[in-house]
Amino acid sequence: MPKMKTKSALKKRVKVTATGKIKREQAFRSHLAQNKTKKQKRQSRKASFMKRSDFKRFKFML
């Protein structure tokens, strides 16, 4: 059976760390920022890690 292809859309949006975690950027940053609080905008600058439940679904795509 041939190897599964990596999903290009996911490959462009995430990075896999050395420990195997999936690192991603926060959503809701691109526009309409005047409606968001300072705290929301500041916290969305940090990257976050994918939750374990999501990781189980996405590991087959990478």
Curated annotation (Swiss-Prot):
UniProt key word Ribonucleoprotein: yes
NCBIfam families the record matches: rpmI_bact
The entry's keywords: Ribonucleoprotein, Ribosomal protein
UniProt record, GO biological process: translation
Name the UniProt record assigns to this protein: Large ribosomal subunit protein bL35
Claim: Ribosomal protein is one of the keywords in the record: yes
Domain of life of the native organism: Bacteria
Species: Mycoplasmopsis synoviae (strain 53)
Xref: SUPFAM superfamilies: L35p-like
Family: Belongs to the bacterial ribosomal protein bL35 family.
A GO cellular component entry from the record: cytosolic large ribosomal subunit
A Gene Ontology molecular function term of the record: structural constituent of ribosome
Lineage: Bacteria, Bacillati, Mycoplasmatota, Mycoplasmoidales, Metamycoplasmataceae
